[in-house]
């Protein structure tokens, strides 16, 4: 009985040792869905009560984007366009080759600022969702966001397709045609 007990302890020790050796750092964070391009930087941005928020939109779209940030319990003050330190900027820009779709965005996080650029409010919304995934609690009501450069655009023109084959019977050729149209 003593040999089995010792064998179990050795196996448990080796398993724990293996788990410790294969643990990875949180620097390479995952984002769902995976962005088109993501490059890690050095350092991190500290999102806190002192961080300012600048949005170059007016009205309902600006209010909806501000509401997205309420997922984090940090109250951000209003900022100005000329602010460059400790600011989160959401900017609508001209359509260009980097932002081919209305849902495309670029997200740049440096230790000084966070900048999300898009050609529409939809792109800013998806950039905000990515930012919320990157935010890690760092204590005392603040969040740490690792420095990163992200460019993202939708891979497909449609976000989803529903085929109800239980009530509306379709041929195999029809379903293949629908999938091919995506």
Q: Which sequence ranges carry the predicted segments?
A:
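Substrate-binding cleft of carbohydrate-active enzyme catalytic domains
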Residues: 155-182
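Ala/Thr-enriched low-complexity intrinsically disordered regions
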Residues: 8, 22-23
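Acidic, contiguous N-terminal accessory segments
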Residues: 12-17, 24-159
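N-terminal secretory signal peptides that target proteins for export/translocation
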Residues: 1-7
